[in-house]
Design a protein with these regions (language model features):
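Periplasm-facing N-terminal accessory domains of Gram-negative outer-membrane beta-barrel systems
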Residues: 2-8, 13, 17-120
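Periplasmic plug
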Residues: 129, 152-155, 160, 166-172, ...
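Outer-membrane beta-barrel translocator/receptor signature
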Residues: 199, 211, 222-225, 236-311, ...
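Structural signature of Gram-negative outer-membrane beta-barrels, strongest in the C-terminal barrel
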Residues: 316-320, 426, 444-449, 453-457, ...
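Face-selective signature of the C-terminal outer-membrane beta-barrel domain
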Residues: 370-395, 417-531, 657
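Membrane-embedded beta-barrel scaffold of Gram-negative outer-membrane proteins
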Residues: 375-381, 385-403, 553, 560-561, ...
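Conserved C-terminal beta-signal and adjacent last beta-strands/turns
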Residues: 448, 656, 685-785
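Gram-negative outer-membrane beta-barrel transporters
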Residues: 513, 613-615, 633-721, 744, ...
Length: 785
C-alpha cells in the first residue's frame, strides 16, 4: 500500500513540474457581463472582477451597464460585481468557446453585504442555469446546456432555509426524499431508486469516496460551498452504482481577499452549532482557508443525542499564470446515539411511547472520516488544459447497538432485538488525470475531454462472530435499562477493489443552436474478497457506461434537450458483497429523458421540466427450477416520472419557488422468496417510493427583513414488496424569518413541522417505525467579515 501511495505522489509531482515548464497558453473565449438593479435599469461604473483558480480579470461597466472580457479560458469562472450603495454580488458562470453572456442584478445595500446566489434574488439565477455544470459533466458547459437534470443547491439557499446537515439539504432538489437508514446512515431516494442498494452515489469535490455507507455519514452544511444533484443513471461521473443519482458535495475554497464567516445557532432539544471559517491571502499568488464546525443535538427521542465535529483546510498556490495548485484536508468525527424506531401498539402509533428509546444505554455508533487531495490545473500550449487530482480517504466506524423493537400483544411487552456489532477500517487512494481542449473542425467548435482514473479501495471488516440470541423483553412504558452484552470484535473479511477507468466526453456544435453532447466511461475493477469463514474469492468486471444527448437552443435562454444514459450497479454494494454475490453480473440500467430549461419574462421566471423513464435489468429474483428454489438475474424494475420546478419573481421583493415530481416506480419482473414459497411481485410498486412530492416556498422581503414559508407534501408509499402495508402521506410546514444588519450580519429564526405532523418517513418493518421529529425551532446568527 505504501508503494502505491508513493507511486501516485511521484506521478502527481512529475506531471505538475512538467506542466509548469511547458505551460504558457492563453484562452480565446469571450464573456459579456450586464449589470442591472432589481428593476432592470442598467448600472454603470460597477467594478466587475472575474476570477478562476489561476487568473483574475477586472473591468468597469460602461454607460450601458456592460463589461466585456476577452482572451479567457473556457470553464467555470466566478463573477463578482461591486458598486457603492448595492450589495456585492457573486455568480458562478461557465464560459464557453462561443461568446457567453450573463446578467447580474444588484440589490440595494452596503458593499460589505456579500451575496452568493441569494435565494431571494431575481429568478434569472435562482436555479443557477448559467453556472458551470461541474456535477454533471467534465465539459465546460453551463447547466442550461446539459442534456440531463442537474440541481445546484447553493450555500446561501441552505442558510436561508436554516438547514444543518447535507442530507436534509438534498431535499431542496425536486423529488428527492431522505430517511435514516440502518446504522443511522443517511439514506436518499431519487427517481424510484435508493442509496440503500447503492443506487445513489455520493461524491466529494467530484471524487467518489466509497459506497454510501462510507461517504454518506452526517456532514455539516457549514463546510460546503454547494451541493450538485445529478439525476438518473450517472455512472459516467460516479462509476458503478448511481442508477438513481449522484450527489456531489463541494467544499469551500480559499478566496483572494481576507474574509471570515461565523455561525452561531441554538434550537429545540438543546441543539447548537458553532462554525468559523477564515480565508487568508498571504500574497496575490498564495491563499489559505480553514473552516471549523461543531454541532451538538440532544435529540427529540430520549438518549438520542449526536455530535458532529468537522475541520476543513485548504491552500491554493499560483506559481505561474498558467499553473494552479491546490491542497485540501477534511477531518470529520460524528458520534450518533441512534433512534431505531417506536413499536407500533395494536398497529398504531401510541403517543405514550413516542419519545422512549429502547436501545441499550451504552450503545456506540461513531465514525471518523478523513479526506485529502492535491489538485493541479495547467494551461498548456495550443489551448490544452491538463488537470490532475491525487486523493486519499480513510474511515473508521464502530457499531454496538440493538436495531429492532417489536410489541408482543400476548405478553404486553416490547422485544428489543437484532443486536448488531461491527467495525470498519477503510483506506482509499487514487489519482485522476484529464485533458480538455476546444477544437475547430469545418469552422464548428468541438469540446473534448479525456482522462484516466486509478484507485485502490482497501476495506477491513470485523463482526461479533457467532453471537447467541440477545433479545430482551421490557415494559413498553417504563423499560428497564439494557446494556451491551460485551462481545469482542472478531475479524471477518477484507475486501479489496482495484479500479482502472478511462473516460471521455465531447460536445459538437452542429449549428449555432444545435449541439450534440456525449460521453463514455470504460472501467475495469477487480474485487478480491478474503473472508475467514469462506476463504478467498475474486471477480473482475468491465462495464461500459455513458450518456449521449442533444441540446437545441430556442433562444440563448431557452433550451430543449433529450438524452439516453446508462449505468451499472452490483447486486450488493461492494462494501458488503458476499462470495455468492460476486458470481452475479452487474445490473444495467438505462434512462431516456427529455425536457426544457428556460429563463423568460426578462429574467422574472425561471423553470425546468423533465420527463424520464428508467429500466433496471438483471435484478435478483427467485425462481423454481426442477423443484429447486434458486436465485437468477432475470428481474426488472422500472420508473417513469415527470419533474417540474419554477422560480418566479413577480416583484423585486417577492419570490415564489415551487417544484413537483410525479413518479411511478414498479417491478416489471420480480419474485420474492417467502420461505414457504415464491410469490410474484410483478406490477407492484417499489417500496418507499412516493407517487408525488411537492414543495412550494413563497418569500417576501421588506427592507432588510425576509420572511418565507415552505409547504412540503410527500405522497403515500408502500412499506413492503407485497404492497399490503401502506405508509400514509404527510404534509409539513416550515417557516423562517431573517433580518440583515450591521453589514454582513444576518439573524434567522426557523420553525419546522409547525403543524406537529406525526408521520413515518420510511420503515422496513410492519411492527415499528421511526417517527419524524415534532415541531421545533432554532435561531441562527451568521456574519461575514
Amino acid at each position: 500500500m505504501i508503494g502505491v501511495i508513493r507511486v501516485l505522489i511521484a506521478f502527481f509531482i512529475a506531471v505538475s513540474y512538467a506542466a509548469a515548464a511547458a505551460a504558457q497558453g492563453s484562452g480565446s473565449a469571450q464573456l459579456t457581463v450586464t449589470v442591472t438593479d432589481t428593476s432592470g435599469a442598467r448600472v454603470p461604473d460597477a467594478a466587475v472582477i472575474l476570477t478562476r483558480s489561476n487568473s483574475e480579470h477586472t473591468a468597469t461597466t460602461n454607460a450601458d451597464g456592460i463589461a466585456m472580457f476577452q482572451g479567457l479560458l473556457t470553464g467555470p469562472w466566478t463573477v463578482e460585481v461591486v458598486k457603492e450603495g448595492f450589495q456585492t454580488r457573486q455568480r458562478r458562470v461557465a464560459v464557453q468557446s462561443a461568446p457567453t453572456s450573463v446578467s447580474v442584478a444588484l440589490e440595494v445595500g452596503g458593499v460589505a453585504e456579500r451575496v452568493l446566489v441569494q435565494a431571494a434574488a431575481p429568478a434569472e439565477d435562482a436555479l443557477q442555469l448559467d453556472a458551470a455544470a461541474t456535477g454533471g459533466t467534465r465539459l465546460d458547459i453551463p447547466v442550461r446546456e446539459l442534456p440531463a437534470t442537474l440541481t445546484v443547491i447553493s450555500q446561501e439557499l441552505i442558510q436561508e432555509r436554516g438547514i444543518n446537515n447535507a442530507t436534509d439539504a438534498t431535499e431542496l432538489a425536486p423529488g428527492v426524499t431522505t430517511f435514516a437508514d440502518s446504522g443511522s446512515i443517511p439514506g436518499i431516494n431519487v427517481r424510484g431508486f435508493s442509496s440503500t442498494s447503492g443506487a445513489v452515489s455520493i461524491l466529494r469535490d467530484g471524487i467518489r469516496q466509497n459506497t454510501v455507507p462510507q461517504s454518506g455519514r452526517p456532514l455539516d452544511t457549514f463546510m460546503l460551498d454547494r451541493i450538485e444533484v445529478l439525476k438518473g443513471p450517472a455512472s459516467l461521473m460516479a462509476g458503478e452504482g448511481a442508477t438513481g443519482a449522484s450527489i456531489n458535495y463541494v467544499t469551500k475554497e480559499p478566496r483572494r481577499e481576507l474574509q471570515a464567516d461565523t455561525l452561531l445557532s441554538y434550537g429545540s432539544w438543546d441543539k447548537y452549532r458553532i462554525g468559523l471559517g477564515v480565508s487568508v491571502p498571504f500574497t496575490s499568488k498564495l491563499a489559505a482557508r480553514i473552516d471549523v464546525s461543531h454541532a451538538d443535538n440532544g435529540g427529540y427521542v430520549e438518549r438520542t443525542s449526536d455530535r458532529l465535529q468537522s475541520v476543513v483546510g485548504g491552500v491554493r498556490w499560483l506559481p505561474t499564470s498558467s499553473l494552479s495548485l491546490k491542497g485540501s484536508l477534511v477531518f470529520t468525527n460524528d458520534r450518533v446515539h441512534p433512534y431505531y424506531g417506536t413499536p407500533l401498539i395494536n398497529n398504531e402509533v401510541d403517543e405514550r411511547v413516542r419519545f422512549i428509546n429502547y436501545n441499550m444505554r451504552d450503545e456506540r455508533n461513531e465514525a471518523k472520516n478523513n479526506y485529502g487531495r492535491l489538485d493541479a490545473e495547467m494551461v498548456l500550449p495550443h489551448g490544452w488544459v491538463l488537470s490532475n487530482s491525487l486523493f486519499a480517504a480513510t474511515q473508521d466506524v464502530e457499531w454496538r447497538e440493538y436495531e429492532s423493537v417489536q410489541y408482543i400483544p400476548a405478553s404486553g411487552l416490547v422485544q428489543v432485538g437484532s443486536y448488531f456489532l461491527a467495525k470498519r477500517d477503510d483506506l482509499l487512494v487514487g489519482n485522476q488525470i484529464d485533458a480538455r481542449k476546444t477544437l475547430t473542425v469545418f469552422s464548428r467548435p468541438i469540446d473534448v475531454v479525456t482522462g484516466y482514473l486509478v484507485q485502490r479501495n482497501d476495506q477491513d471488516r470485523w463482526t461479533g462472530g457467532t453471537i447467541p440470541n440477545q433479545n430482551r423483553l421490557v415494559d413498553p412504558f417504563n423499560p428497564e435499562p439494557i446494556f451491551d452484552p460485551g462481545f469482542p470484535f472478531v475479524f471477518d473479511r477484507n475486501v479489496l477493489v482495484n479500479t482502472h477507468t478511462f473516460f471521455g466526453e465531447g460536445r459538437v456544435g452542429v449549428t449555432e443552436r444545435l449541439k450534440f453532447v456525449g460521453g463514455v466511461r470504460w472501467e475495469h475493477f477487480q474485487v478480491d474478497r478474503d473472508q475467514v469463514s469462506t476463504g478467498f474469492a475474486s471477480q473482475a468486471y468491465t462495464p461500459t457506461t455513458g450518456r449521449v444527448g442533444a441540446v437545441y437552443m430556442l433562444t440563448p435562454l431557452v433550451s430543449l434537450y433529450t438524452s439516453l444514459s446508462r449505468a451499472v450497479e452490483p447486486t450488493t454494494p461492494l462494501v458488503s458483497i458476499t462470495a455468492a454475490s460476486m458470481s452475479f453480473s452487474l445490473q444495467p440500467s438505462r434512462q431516456w429523458e427529455g425536457g426544457t430549461k428556460a429563463t423568460i419574462f426578462g429574467g422574472r421566471l425561471e423553470t425546468t421540466f423533465a420527463l424520464f423513464g428508467i429500466n433496471k435489468e438483471d435484478i435478483l429474483t427467485n425462481t423454481i427450477v426442477d423443484g429447486v428454489r434458486i436465485q437468477q438475474q432475470i428481474g426488472e424494475q422500472m420508473s417513469r416520472g415527470v419533474e417540474w420546478s419554477v422560480t418566479a419573481t413577480p416583484t423585486p421583493s417577492f419570490v415564489v419557488m415551487a417544484d413537483v415530481t410525479a413518479l411511478n416506480a414498479e417491478y416489471v419482473e420480480f419474485n420474492e422468496n417467502l420461505g414457504a414459497g415464491v410469490v410474484s411481485r410483478a406490477g407492484n410498486d417499489v417500496p418507499h417510493m412516493p407517487g408525488v412530492v411537492f414543495n412550494i416556498t413563497p418569500m417576501q422581503r421588506i427592507g432588510p427583513v425576509s420572511v418565507s414559508a415552505t409547504v412540503r407534501k410527500v405522497g403515500e408509499r408502500w412499506r413492503d414488496n407485497a404492497n399490503l402495508i401502506r405508509l400514509e402521506p404527510y404534509t409539513t410546514v416550515s417557516a423562517s424569518a431573517s433580518v440583515r444588519f450591521l453589514r454582513g450580519t444576518r439573524l434567522t429564526v426557523t420553525g419546522r413541522n409547525l403543524t406537529d405532523e406525526i408521520y413515518i418517513p420510511r420503515s422496513n418493518s410492519d411492527v415499528s417505525g421511526r417517527i419524524a421529529a415534532p415541531r421545533s425551532f432554532d435561531v441562527q446568527l451568521t456574519r461575514i467579515f
